[in-house]
């Protein structure tokens, strides 16, 4: 992975911030309950790199002209025309809306396809959601991909100095007959108050009734424009602050150089902190079958060994053999009379004439054509022969025919250990966070309290203090095979192995994927069947797990009673880790320290420190001692915007390393030639085609496995190390808490404390990686008196505050607990499930804004069922649980 050189040449760009308001009155043909959104207003604010930092846009800019535009008729068409007119004299025009991918940009995509006033756009999509859309110099972005928060949260998060606040508007009142309405306040129902959260709904009615009682005159046309202008102003000012902070702190423009917050943070790292030759690029086939050697090639080579009764040097055993002529060959062996070379030609990579008969002069993804590949293959073969070697060659398609017709060969190859054992796939070691409910209900008894603690900035803590692999990995063969007192003490990297867990560990260590979930179990067979009884399996073969894990998790597992039975493959790496004493080392230390410093300074002085220089000096010294970061006294001041950006950069950085290499892609096709090119392409695997009209198709595809090349930005081993160390950090609390732990989620634990002598109590603090009290906002000494959980990310509890008041908290993944939903899903309703008073699910009915496959935005009625589902552990007693396989 290479650092990015900073391009000092200034690029002049235009930024257009916009928002559509829509009517939703026209029903979809054949479905009167589904209504189509049709834009009837667009407000756009245009700035350029010369003037974008100005808060006010009242005066025109000498470079980009007028700033604000209001389009009432054909708003989509007029916005596109504005963007096209803005292109001359500028490198690019970036059009940005909040939730553009799910809403605003959908209208633009349909317009561009139907009207054909520009070339067809190129898309990066996630399902029907548009991540980015490009049309020549026009680039459409979604600000929600940079800061994932509602528009109403932006003024506070970015410290906007104007008195901006996102107001309420009666969207359901936006109908054709009301466009010229002037009169009393519209009905409250048109504001959809039941979709607001309870507190927000209460504030809305206070505001609404105040205006209604004051006989406020509601001018729909003016109110619509004011509301939309306010939204665009909030978006523009937040994006400008966001951009300036990225430019100042990382020399990166997030909008012109990236499409998401993760890619922007990653670019800051590569521009400012990545050292050359530090992070390796992982070969597509891993390190065991080096140089992209295929499973088929190894299968043929082991068959040739068997047929010839010769031991052949090949990648299945070590590495491909390098001839003195500096040529890597697939297989090599010697006889008394001759030196033999064996070559397996993959049809795609070597340009097979039989398999690929068309488009042979089309440039493929790696920059050459099929004809060029064949010419290169023939030239190498001729060079091998002319050097005196006996050459045996086979094409992949010929091998495929052999394996189908030669039963002896098929049986031998399929049962050969070098073929049967799949190479280590680093993505198999990349697991997510640990989320489990150990109980479904717990009410405190006398002398007990339930506490809720959270690790402060868990992933930034791991990125700074955790260990990371560096340079290029290598396969370690010395420790593979059946277990013979194998020691992993010298191993750093990934290990593919078979492990036998203990049978009495309340919190298992190693994660496994089953039933589309991340489980922590003690018996494979019990996990597979979700056995609700004590483990009946006596044969270790029924209990073992085979998988790939980061070696640190395996070391902890061994310490907790796991046994390694067989090691299949090891990827060995060099390691770097930050040393607190020397304040050196670590892969991401410089990046994390930079934004940790910004965040800490932008948080301002602790309470009571503002006018106490001695206290300030102690604070700066303590932070330097703890984190190795020197705060600047003059820079310590509350700055919500700067703090928000720093926090985003700390939390949004590492995930880019885990990005998949072969993401689905969408191409808009309007010619028969282009369609045939995709259908006949050796690089593309068509996954779907959708006719838009008589002239246009959406074609979805992925790259074929042969065409996938190693990513130059992803490193799954780095991502796996991050999440593994995060799980181990959580385990440092789960292990001593034992059965007192009621619930955990990635970086947090809910547990029972009895304050008995010698009882373990997780320590809290304020620094990176310390535990913090999640209940402190209710007042010091607050605790949970009753906790219930219907499964991971499905819980509710009652907080008892120091003043004796009680507060209810409820969280259910996938459900917005607005006023309407909160009346159906709450502490009491969840408890009624847990204690057996209710069996039927809660059914929620609501209107939802969706996108059709044709990128039409609609509102349609939907239903969602909700009921507890605790399946990650087996039940134990009335409300407890044990891991699958516990005995």
Language model features with spans:
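Histidine-centered active-site/metal-ligand motif
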Residues: 1, 98, 349-350
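Active-site beta-strand-loop-beta-strand hairpin of nuclease catalytic cores
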Residues: 329-354
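Acidic-and-aromatic substrate-binding clefts and catalytic sites of carbohydrate-active enzymes
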Residues: 320-324, 400-401
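Polybasic, low-complexity terminal segments and linkers that are predominantly intrinsically disordered
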Residues: 1-3, 396-401
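Conserved acidic
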Residues: 11, 15-17, 26, 32-314, ...
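A solvent-exposed, charged loop/short amphipathic helix patch at secondary-structure junctions
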Residues: 350-372
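Catalytic centers of nucleases
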Residues: 322-330, 745
